[in-house]
Amino acid sequence: MDAKTFKILLVDDEPDILEILSYPLKNEGFQVHTANNGLEAIKLAKDIQPHLIVLDVMMPEMDGIEACEIIRKDPKISNTLITFLSARGEDYSKIAGFNAGADDYITKPIKPKVLVSKVKS
């Protein structure tokens, strides 16, 4: 994987979280784009066609679960890797994420270095 061509879409309604997670990924050379909710994420994903979407579950306007389901049905972006990053760590939340089509589910808080390591793997 070439970090310079690898596009990541980070989606969270908390600007501080987007900034904390974006910084180390950008320092590693990844192309990082951000969105604040599921609706923005879908629109941006169609435009930039990211390799990975890191998606919060609980957001206004459209939550991550619904956004994931819509992404999986869109042939243009359906093969995009999707990782949920959520404060909801209950089994039923993780199961809902995987049932929606997620490839991975990580619970917050996550150290930015750990996220970078997961992206690289």
What spans do the regions from the language model cover?
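Short hydrophobic/Thr-rich beta-strand motif most characteristic of the beta2 strand and flanking loop
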Residues: G29-N36, L44
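C-terminal output helix
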Residues: P109-K120
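Active-site beta3 strand of CheY-like receiver
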Residues: I48-V54
